[in-house]
């Protein structure tokens, strides 16, 4: 699973995912990309599930770039615990995704556009947000 090696703070404040993405909103490496149409927290398990879905479909004929990383820890208090007495313990690691952010990029060695779009479509089913598939050079 993806998670940072070290963090400055174990339990950071919650970050807003409202608004548009300021960075990573251009297709840099691949021919096709999966772009977020709405903001959300995406967990390390969801990122890994999407990566596995893409790589299994492409079967070594392509390359996948993951442009998001779960830097933020979300905390949760145990069940049936009264309010107060501090913040809960870190439960999972999430990536903050805003509208317009390029999540994954794909390039197929056989230059098959069909394979690239199908791999991204399979990955989009593993994510909790609405996404769109964009070709390199097209407007995001």
Curated annotation (Swiss-Prot):
GO molecular function: rRNA binding; structural constituent of ribosome; tRNA binding
Organism superkingdom: Bacteria
SUPFAM superfamilies: Ribosomal protein L16p/L10e
Keyword Ribonucleoprotein found: yes
GO cellular component entries: cytosolic large ribosomal subunit
UniProt key word RNA-binding: yes
An annotated GO BP: translation
Annotated keywords: Ribonucleoprotein, Ribosomal protein, RNA-binding, rRNA-binding, tRNA-binding
Subunit structure, as described in the record: Part of the 50S ribosomal subunit.
Function (record text): Binds 23S rRNA and is also seen to make contacts with the A and possibly P site tRNAs.
Family: Belongs to the universal ribosomal protein uL16 family.
Protein name: Large ribosomal subunit protein uL16
Name of the coding gene: rplP
């Amino acid at each position: 699973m993806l998670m940072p090696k070290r963090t400055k703070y174990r339990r950071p404040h919650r970050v807003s995912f409202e608004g548009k993405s300021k960075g990573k909103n251009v297709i840099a490496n691949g021919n096709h990309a999966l772009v977020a149409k709405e903001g959300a927290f995406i967990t390390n398990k969801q990122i890994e599930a999407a990566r596995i879905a893409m790589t299994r479909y492409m079967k070594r004929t392509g390359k996948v770039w993951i442009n998001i990383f779960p830097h933020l820890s979300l905390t949760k208090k145990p069940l049936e615990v009264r309010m107060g007495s501090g913040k809960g313990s870190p439960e999972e690691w999430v990536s903050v995704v805003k509208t317009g952010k390029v999540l994954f990029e794909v390039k197929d060695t056989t230059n098959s556009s069909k394979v690239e779009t199908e791999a991204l479509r399979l990955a989009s089913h593993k994510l909790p947000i609405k996404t769109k598939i964009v070709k390199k050079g097209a407007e995001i």
